[in-house]
């Protein structure tokens, strides 16, 4: 029993050390991450922790009503809030969406409607246009749901090799 507990403790310590290493690397090269699921309290819980620890710059996509309703009680004052209905960059994202999906018959009206209905598209387009480095979802949707949107929008994003993995 003692040996099992000791092994568990060592595994847990290694995991925590690994997580701490990831956090330190993230802080050293702070990226802008979009959180498109503003209708889940877990988004705000995570955002508050990330902002408090200085791990990343955050963008939360949501209407003022969604932010007020679901984000109440969380300190997200360091995050940028993007209202997908009133964002000054919206037309740029619509144009990019149409450019990428015009062969599939996507019109500006369809792009606008899709972006207002599904914030993951908005997040992907922010990344595609260089306004964010990445997006995290999965609180309200499955991984395959998010991956489908990423594939539709991000297929033309060039792969960046990290400096320590030039041969990868």
Labelled PLM ranges:
Residues 1-15:
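Short, Lys/Arg-enriched N-terminal segments with co-localized hydrophobic residues
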């Amino acid at each position: 029993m003692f040996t099992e507990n000791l092994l568990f403790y060592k595994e847990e310590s290694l995991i925590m050390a690994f997580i701490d290493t990831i956090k330190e690397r993230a802080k050293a090269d702070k990226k802008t991450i979009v959180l498109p699921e503003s209708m889940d309290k877990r988004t705000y819980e995570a955002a508050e922790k990330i902002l408090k620890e200085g791990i990343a710059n955050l963008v939360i996509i949501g209407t003022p009503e969604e932010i007020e309703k679901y984000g109440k009680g969380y300190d997200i004052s360091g995050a940028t809030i993007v209202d997908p209905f009133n964002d000054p960059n919206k037309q740029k994202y619509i144009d990019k969406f149409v450019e990428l999906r015009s062969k599939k018959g996507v019109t500006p009206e369809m792009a606008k409607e899709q972006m207002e209905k599904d914030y993951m598209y908005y997040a992907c387009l922010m990344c595609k246009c260089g306004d964010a480095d990445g997006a995290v979802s999965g609180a309200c949707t499955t991984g395959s749901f998010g991956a489908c949107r990423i594939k539709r929008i991000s297929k033309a994003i060039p792969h960046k090799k990290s400096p320590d993995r030039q041969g990868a």
